[in-house]
Amino acid sequence: MNHALRWTAGAGLLLACLVQGAFAERLLLQVEDFDGPWRRQTNIAGYLGTGFCTSNANPKIADVVMRKTATLKEPGRYAVWVRAYTSENSRRALQAEVNGKRLAVTHKDRRRRWVWELAGTLDLAAGPVEIVIHDADVGFESADAILLTSEKDDDPMADEKQWLLYPDKLPDQANALRFNIEACLALTKERRDAASKEEWEARRKSVAAELQKALGLDPWPERTPLNPRVTGRAEREAYTIENVVFESRPHFCVTANVYVPKGGPTPRAAVVVVPGHAMKEGKNYDLYRLGELGLVAQGFTVLAYDPIGQGERQLRGYSHAAGYAALLVGWTNEGFIVWDTVRAIDYLASRPDVDPKRIGLTGNSGGGENTFYTMPIEPRLAAGASFCFVCSYHDWVKDGGDHCICNHMPGILRHMEEFEIVGLNAPRPFLAGNGAKDPIFPIAGTRRTMERARAIYALQGAESSLRQVDVPLPHGWAQPLREAAYGWLSKWLLGKGDGSPVPEPKLQPDDLASKDLYCLKDGKMPADALSYAALIRAEAERLIAAYPPMPAEPAERANWAKALRERLWQTLGGEPPARAEARSLGTFAWEGHSVERLAIQTEPNLEVPALLIRPKGAAARTPAVIFLDDAGKEAARSSSLVGGLLRSGIAVLAMDPRALGEGAVHLNHCASDAVLLGRPLLAQQAWDAICAARYLKTRPDVAGDRVAAYAHGNVGLIATLAAALSHDLSAAATDGAPGSLVAAIADPLPLPQWAYAANVLKAADVPQWIALCARRPFLCVKPPAAGAPPPPADATLSFLLAALKPR
């Protein structure tokens, strides 16, 4: 017998069936109905019931459990299955316990998916049975359901596996992360060394211009009043701490500590120190304060500030994750941090005790990144020292792993490699210091980049102004690297020494809790302060307000649509070569319908999984609907819309665009590498839908002039963009998709990372995408407002049936 699971939104489902003359029992329990402190969540699509539960002990193993007592009607030998979520970047193992007996640890796998795993078998009596779920590893363990079954050979995965093309392992040809990494590497290999000074000078201008664009600083922001204010001052034996708040943009406040040495001549040389990803401590992180005070001991005035999302700016509306929202308007996290640094230099230059011709910049990790990107565009910097960042894009993308979105500038790999960015500094002094055991920025890439940059410095006779230092240590601003900063900056800004490391004196930093280290004495921004997210939203609204209206006259409207479509393609990285191919991986029967597993080729070396469901008794050529769902293509099994389409004789192609559903990969890693590539993941996914439509049109059993798309949830953005970019879809309907990308701008992010396409709002918002579908049927069903009745359940079905009638 095929005992496929059927589930509802209820607390549990009890099924009993007769097997070989004996009663067998199946008890399905939803973990969200267990008792315990694990957090109830719904943010990962594909769960059963009404949600799932997540342990919050990360990065420790929780000592709290989820517990439920249920009742078995029949005694017998029971298999205990656990359904939970696994992912490649997190250790999420669980352990089930039944009536005090702990079973095998499950979900050690590192593949991104919901999956049933067998925990063990045991003999159970009829009556009460207690089930306990334990955390068994250091990730965010996410438990969905428990199944106790005494049915012989019962496998809850058997039915699910039919709907999977890759039940055991995601192959390389379906791995969107691999695809984006390889595409990035192909671009980095195109960068060549300049053969002459003349060649470099010609290239230098374009590299500088493209860097400014990639950072989101083209045009330059206006240098508005800094409105600096000192909120506190504290005396120490050798220096004074000044707590300073300034505005890098109107009402956008930066919190900074200025350390002023006591004694010595003025005006002094100064150094801006930008911290790395010390999210809680920011400028006050222990290793960074040691570096700040070490520079003060050399005689520098030091300004250390909190980048967005760190230290005193670790507030709602300021997080690094909002950098995805910034991409929509053509801004970047790093561009904002670079501009904060430029304004910090403005502030230092305004002080009478600072020599504006002797200002330097340094930082580690994210601060090394800021040094790397700020120095080429800020000519007032007399010297720079970047630590634990400089690498090569090639080695960093290939071996460095996942990164914060602040490291990713849109399309930058199309225009430069890191050695060229370092070369923009020539002949000004620049030092790169790294840990040889740094897994994030492989040292081979650092050495290669600095060697290639040295050739550019040599063209200007400035080889002595460039230095690379590495130490046998992992990632971090360790003492040997801090000492390298002291010596390098002292040589070029103080005229002391030969640039070799200077021993760090014994330092006595304040306790982290000292109020003298904080600018916001009440922990709050000024009442009129604007957050990062607020600035992004305002820019989005400004861009949208400037869109030209769609012309009323048909000929002008056609020209408008053609121009806008071309601009969208250009913004999204260009239209790839057309494809309309697929390979069949077999068929199976489902409720009388025929289901064909298809791997649709959407790129020369990438495929996406799909299932073509042909209705029973179908005509020789049927219309078709491409089905997308946030929960993945398997959601077609329980979709009433799919059922209605099949009963009406319409085929359904349920597919997973790249990086989603069965093809899920580490989303931040994949989406951020797509940013570097200059082909946003949303645009790639829309291309998958376009290729699927083109493939369907080649099939003899599909009416090629009647291929529509339906999308439920956020994936409606994919369907809408696909319909806007291509006429291959004759109609489209979305249910629950955002009606504007302005809705995607918030902190925390309201949409998944794949939805944030760099620069797209400079071209068009969702209403303009829909306008490009004019003359084709388009339905956008939005979630009803509070208190409003929902739309009729069959409204979308009626729309699609009408849209797919023969013309």
Regions found by a protein language model. Give the residues of each.
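Alpha/beta-hydrolase-fold serine-hydrolase catalytic core, especially in secreted/extracellular enzymes
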Residues: D155-V254, A426-P609, I613-P623, A631-R637, ...
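Bacterial N-terminal signal peptides
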Residues: A9-L18
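Alpha-helix capping and helix-loop boundary segments enriched in small/acidic/polar residues
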Residues: M279-L290, A325-W339, L361-F372, W396, ...
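Extracytoplasmic
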Residues: A24-P156
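Cap/lid segment of the alpha/beta-hydrolase catalytic domain
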Residues: P265-I345, A349-S350, V390-G400, A620-K697, ...
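Primarily recognizes the serine-hydrolase "nucleophile elbow" in alpha/beta-hydrolase
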Residues: D346-R414, A692-A763, W769
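Generic beta-strand/beta-sheet core signal
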Residues: Y259-P261, V274, Y305, T362-N364, ...
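N-terminal secretory signal peptides that target proteins for export/translocation
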Residues: M1-L5
